[in-house]
């Protein structure tokens, strides 16, 4: 998921602390931020609805028959774009999924929120673990699922938070709810190689 360091020391950061409303939603939401430490490479899940948030772009939002945003764009080499909202319903409907580190967010069906994009696998600790998935979009007829630590979207409810220590996006709200969930906090893995 990205590394940095000198002389045998490598730092891997997976994600970062997410701010509220990360992931696809049916209303505007907040941003998942990339670490501002220049020595750290980050890979996040879904960002804010309709914004270029963190590494993964947020899902497109929809409310009361009007497309309120366009999908956010992912950061090259770190995350992917968010998915589009549904276009067939004349009422508040499904939000697109947040982009994950490994794939774009899914596009929403009629009134059902879309799934977030998948994350990326890292085996730096010796066991492969997939992290930094996108959060699911909210919907009025069903919720989208967050993948690889991403929070589920809300079914006429607020979204669920991303899993801690994954850097994955939170789920977006559905229906007339406007509170998405925070992304999972990031982790830093240090690996040292002793020189003979």
Regions found by a protein language model. Name each.
Residues 1-196:
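Low-complexity, glycine/proline-biased repetitive segments and flexible coils/loops
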